[in-house]
């Protein structure tokens, strides 16, 4: 970074402002382990104190909005871990720390390690939901990885005895606290995966401090849980306790007892469900039989209606009705045709054809005579019009003009010769006469002089 210096002369206020900007921009936020001294808590709610070690000290302030989140009351001489911003108090030129977070030194270091490991594993994808394996439903055999002397195992067994006493349980005893605990937990997970005896595992312990639960914040334990082929339920501490194992496990239970309830079946609930299903089945069977009985009654009635004797009687009645209808129809048909025949005879008697034939024959002869006369008149008029048209055509025909002694000349490219400027001496002309063509060459061109008329005044 380039320093904001120039060749000018600094004022004190500008110097302090520049130093403050350098401190804030270069250092940013830091974690600091130190001892508290000169702690004061005025009515404003802000905290003012000094952070020191055996060789140096620095002033610090923690504003009310930040210190309200601190879960303990700081004391002089107490070792703490703080996260702070380095700044400079410009009026006095004193640099100081603005504290944003404060924890007791022991738990604070562990919490810092917890956050760093959590960020690391999260970045690697160990917490992704896509890696979570579903729990078997129902579980056929349960594995429990915990201490045999702890309250967690006692709680799990009591819950299973009450809810699902028929569920087989395999206990993988391990230490859950101390330096050896992480390796024992890892070995128990690997052993359960090698034996394939159970289809779900509970890994957990009872409550305790952050340091007591630290085995379940071990990176090696987290990776062993992640690589397990058997689904794992994490059940560490109380509901407010959160460990790395909770994030990596396929399912997190707030307590060991809750984990036992999650992986087991409630036999009383199952019994109620079976009874409910039995009642529903009985009702369905009753409805089914009633429906079938109703269908049987309908079919029986239809069968009786389709008995051969009944069908034969209905067919006989139908045949009698059809025969009567046929007889009535024939009688009506004969009667109607008889009346029509009589009317036709009367019309034929009144309409003698010989007189009509004679009358129509006379009309045809008259029409034929009129038609012939009209055709002859039309032909005569057309001949007269044709003769007139021929005379007119001969009068306007170019050939008739040529017959009177005129001619038509064309240039060599076929254009009609109208003016002398269309040709030059030596051009060949084609001249049309009445009885043929003459080809000639232009020897001389003479233009007619225009006569100027004198102006009369």
Curated annotation (Swiss-Prot):
Keywords tagged on the record? Cytoplasm, Exonuclease, Hydrolase, Nuclease
Which is one Gene Ontology cellular component term of this protein? Answer: cytoplasm
Where is this protein primarily located?
A: cytoplasm
Q: Which GO terms describe its biological process?
A: DNA catabolic process
GO molecular-function term, one example from the UniProt record: exodeoxyribonuclease VII activity
Pfam families annotated for this entry?
Exonuc_VII_L, tRNA_anti_2
List the InterPro entries hit by this protein, alphabetically. Answer: Exonuc_VII_L, Exonuc_VII_lsu_C, OB-fold_nuc-bd_dom
- Which domain of life does the protein's organism represent? Bacteria
EC top class, as a word:
hydrolase
| Enzyme Commission code | 3.1.11.6
> Where located?
Cytoplasm
Q: What is this enzyme's catalytic activity, as reactions?
A: Exonucleolytic cleavage in either 5'- to 3'- or 3'- to 5'-direction to yield nucleoside 5'-phosphates
Question: What function does the entry list?
Answer: Bidirectionally degrades single-stranded DNA into large acid-insoluble oligonucleotides, which are then degraded further into small acid-soluble oligonucleotides.
Subunit organization? Heterooligomer composed of large and small subunits.
The entry sums up its family as follows: Belongs to the XseA family.
- Protein known as: Exodeoxyribonuclease 7 large subunit
């Amino acid at each position: 970074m380039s320093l904001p210096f120039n060749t000018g002369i600094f004022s004190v206020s500008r110097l302090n402002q520049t130093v403050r900007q350098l401190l804030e921009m270069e250092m940013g936020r830091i974690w600091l382990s130190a001892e508290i001294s000169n702690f004061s808590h005025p009515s404003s709610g802000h905290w003012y104190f000094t952070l020191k070690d055996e060789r140096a000290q620095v002033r610090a302030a923690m504003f009310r909005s930040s210190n309200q989140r601190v879960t303990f009351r700081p004391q002089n001489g107490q070792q703490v871990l703080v996260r702070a911003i380095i700044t400079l108090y410009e009026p006095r030129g004193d640099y100081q720390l603005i504290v944003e977070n404060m924890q007791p030194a022991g738990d604070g270091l562990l919490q810092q390690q917890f956050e760093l490991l959590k960020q690391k594993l999260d970045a690697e994808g160990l917490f992704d939901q896509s890696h979570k394996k579903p729990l078997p439903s129902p579980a056929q055999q349960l594995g429990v990885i915990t201490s045999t002397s702890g309250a967690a195992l006692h709680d799990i067994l009591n819950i299973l005895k009450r809810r699902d006493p028929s569920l087989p349980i395999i206990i993988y005893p391990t230490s859950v606290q101390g330096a050896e605990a992480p390796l024992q937990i890892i070995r128990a997970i690997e052993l359960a995966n090698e034996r394939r005896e159970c289809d779900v595992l509970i890994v957990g312990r009872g409550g305790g401090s952050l340091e007591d639960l630290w085995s379940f914040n071990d990176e090696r334990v987290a990776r062993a849980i992640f690589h397990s082929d058997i689904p794992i339920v994490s059940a560490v501490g109380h509901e407010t306790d959160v460990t790395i194992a909770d994030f990596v496990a396929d399912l997190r239970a707030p307590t060991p007892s809750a984990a036992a309830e999650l992986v087991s079946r409630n036999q009383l609930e199952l019994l109620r469900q079976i009874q409910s299903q039995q009642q529903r089945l009985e009702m369905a069977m009753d409805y089914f039989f009633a429906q079938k009985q109703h269908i049987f009654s309908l079919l029986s009635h239809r069968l009786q209606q389709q008995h051969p004797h009944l069908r034969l009687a209905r067919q006989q009645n139908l045949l009698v009705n059809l025969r009567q209808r046929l007889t009535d129809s024939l009688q009506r048909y004969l009667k109607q045709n008889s009346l029509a025949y009589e009317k036709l005879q009367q019309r034929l008697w009144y309409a003698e054809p010989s007189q009509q034939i004679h009358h129509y024959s006379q009309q045809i002869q008259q029409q034929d005579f009129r038609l012939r006369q009209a055709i002859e008149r039309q032909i005569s008029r057309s001949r007269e019009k044709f003769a007139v048209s021929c005379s007119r055509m001969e009068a306007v025909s170019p050939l008739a003009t040529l017959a009177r002694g005129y001619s038509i000349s064309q240039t060599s490219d076929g254009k009609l010769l109208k003016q002398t400027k269309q040709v030059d001496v030596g051009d060949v002309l084609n001249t049309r006469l009445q009885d043929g063509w003459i080809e000639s060459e232009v020897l001389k061109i003479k233009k007619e002089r225009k006569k100027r008329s004198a102006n009369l005044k």
